[in-house]
Every structure is written in structure tokens, then in C-alpha cells.
């Protein structure tokens, strides 16, 4: 994927950034419209070097199986599962596309990017155990959460989670929601395969090239200004469509584009850190993604988790996140990123968040004050016998949370992702963080439908081959869910027991 020497002047599609979002959109377009030319510009010298890198993101295969922030408790003690169902539906779409891509040779060797790992919710204390029981009662009978277990027996806990059981005082009640069918996704490896496919099929890749400006032309195309960061060479590229998949850098470019849809948006950067286990014996004692419950008043990003990862076919173990603060919008960004993002059209939104999100400010202050002993103290809630010498602190990627205008409040902080697309469909971008990468496919399908409404009608047949459930809520169609689940499990090598054949799956879906 070396740089091209010839200066390119025209292309059909420009992808800004070589992360999971651009890679997904590019791979979709390659399948749907192979005659369109695609040029990808990445400011760094490698694919997936920012938030898509496996050590820079949580990589949970976000499907709301274990993340408690998606299942808030109501005042009457019941649990609201709407967000969890929505996130899981989105992950099923991504999973289907990955399976299709494996069948088509777009992706190879699934175990390089996806592996089966149980997803587990963990709480302690009588009140929290009661909540987790209510969560189980709300989810266990649901199509998308079938097989979930509720565990409150110390012996069973100890058998399944020996690292977490060692040294634990079980006089304090514990409870688990255990989902055996969870996955770990290495989005770095996945992105590299998708970008490789785009390159092999004629897409042009420019690394060390930074997009510095975007100007719309009278024919609705865009003039994209690009600088080679190594040589200083500047070039302009004229493109019919631009996708800004630049992670934390997307806000700046969308602002520079001048589209009205980007006005009022702001970004709040939060840096992340994790403790990474360096003791192979401890890593071998834990094989699950275990998510806890955020402290009262703490933001969703603070949910602690002891997280098995599979990176480069090797298991690893992380605990965190610990929050920090930096004005940079990218891990390898600039300290001027935050102040440079403040504009007349979003300053009220930014100031509004400063007033309304005092809980976040308090959380960040407490996190910044933590030393090594404080971080190990947090870890011991999960692994009571944890010792500092077995863990190292690593810096993860920057998370830029979306700030959006809100009537009467100035602005509110949104913990999610938002697709921003121009009314004429000529440019789109993605803002925000979690659940992020796990919902890349539905997010990019949204981009396609909003930006190419005419072409989208003609693409529906092909899209149904890629995502058999497209246009259908699996929640309402258990039979279809069973088919696509069995098919994708087999193709992605997640179910060694085997499953039904894939050929008839797409044929069972009604026209969307």
C-alpha cells in the first residue's frame, strides 16, 4: 500500500482516514459499484493507527450483552432494554456483512479479527444483585439475548472466573449475567483486511497525506486539498463524494466544509488509559469480557471492565478505562484541536455542556488525581489479589464525545455516534465514540442511503446478499435471526458445532 507518485486530479470517492469506518464504506462501495474510483488519504503512515488500533479501543464486539449503561434501571425497579436491543440489532448487521465478506474473499481467516469470548456483567452488593436479576429477567427471554445466564453462586463464580474469585470475600453478594456467545473483535486487523481489499481492487491509497481543506464546487463536487506530510507537496483532488472518517479529526473537516448540517456540533475530548497485564499466568486465568457498573453520577464512559483481548492470535488482558484529559482530538493530534473547534455556531453548545455536565467534570478531576495505587485499588474490585508489578499502564485512543445543540440547554453531551450528511448527499462524516466500530456497517449503510438515495434503490438486491436481514428487525423475526446467526457463526468460525448452510438465507427476506 505504498504512496502513488502521480498527482491525481479526479476521483469518484474520497475517503478521509484509513480507519474502520472508511474501510467499511469503501468495501461496501467496491461491492456495490466496482466501476467507481476510490482514493483514501490517511495522515499517518499506517492503516488503523488511531482509534481502530486494538490497543486504542475497547474492542468488545459491542452488542450490549454486558454493558450495563445500555440497560438503565427505572424508578420502579424494572430495567429499560430499548438501547440494548438497538445496539445488538446493529451488531448483528455488522456480523452478517463480515460473514458475507469472508464468503466472497473480501476477508480471510476470521480468527485474525473475531473470536468467541463470553460477555459478562458483574456487580456486588445486595442492591446491585437485585438490579442484575431484573436485567436478566428483562433480557433472557428476548430473541437477541437468548442463552443469557444469571449466576449468584460463589462456587459457580469461582469456577468460571478464577482470577476474580481469588481472595474475594463472598459475604458481599455477587451476581453475573453471563452471555456465552459474545465475541472479541480486533478492529485493527479487520480494518487492514478491508483496506487491503480496496487497494487490490483498484483503490488508491495515500499514506502520510493529510486532508487540510474541503471546498464545494458549483456542480456539487468537492475540491479536496491534501498535503504530503513527509515532503510538503500539496495537491488538489476533485471528487464527486467525500466521506470524512477521520475519527476525532472529522469535526474539523466537516466544519471546514461549511455544510449547514455540521453547524452547532462540538466535540469534547477524553483520553483513555488501561492497565495491561504482563503476567501470562494471570492472563490464562481469565477468559471473558467482564463489565461492571459505573459509580453513581459517573458518565457511561467510566464503566470499568476486565477485558480479555485476542490480538495477533494471542490472548491479552486489560483493565480500565481510566480517563485523562487532553485538548487533542486524536492520539497523534494537536493541542490546538479543541480550541480550534470552537466556532460562533457552536460556542453556546460548548458552554452549555460546561454547565450541564458537572458530573463529567468531577469524574475527570478524580481520574486525573489517581496514582498507581489508586488504579490498582480500582482493579482489586475485580481481581482482589492484583499486584502492581503484574500490570503496566498504556495510553489508549482519544474519544471525542459529540456535543449537540439542545433547546433550552445550549448543548448536551451525547455518548454515541452521529452520522452527519449534507442535504445534497455529496459529503458525510461520522462523529462520536462508543459503540463506534461495532456498528460500522449499519452506520455506513445509513451513509449510503442518505447520500445515494437513487442508487440505493438499485443496490437493494446486492445489499440483501451482504446483509440478509437488512430492513428487518431481528427482534420481530426469530426464524430469520436463527438462520443468520447460524450462518454467520459457521462462516466466522465462531461455532465449532456447525450450522445451517448459508445459501438460502438471503432468499428468506422480504423486499426492503
From Swiss-Prot:
GO terms for biological process: tricarboxylic acid cycle. GO terms for molecular function: 2-hydroxyglutarate dehydrogenase activity; L-malate dehydrogenase (quinone) activity. Its EC number is 1.1.5.4. PANTHER family: L-2-HYDROXYGLUTARATE DEHYDROGENASE, MITOCHONDRIAL. It catalyses: (S)-malate + a quinone = a quinol + oxaloacetate. Pfam families: Mqo. Keywords: FAD, Flavoprotein, Oxidoreductase, Tricarboxylic acid cycle. It is an enzyme of class 1 (oxidoreductase). Gene3D superfamilies: D-Amino Acid Oxidase, subunit A, domain 2 (3.30.9.10), FAD/NAD(P)-binding domain (3.50.50.60). Its cofactor is FAD. Belongs to the MQO family. Pathway: Carbohydrate metabolism; tricarboxylic acid cycle; oxaloacetate from (S)-malate (quinone route): step 1/1. Signal peptide: none annotated. This is Probable malate:quinone oxidoreductase. InterPro entries: FAD/NAD-bd_sf (IPR036188), MQO (IPR006231). It comes from Rhodococcus erythropolis (strain PR4 / NBRC 100887).
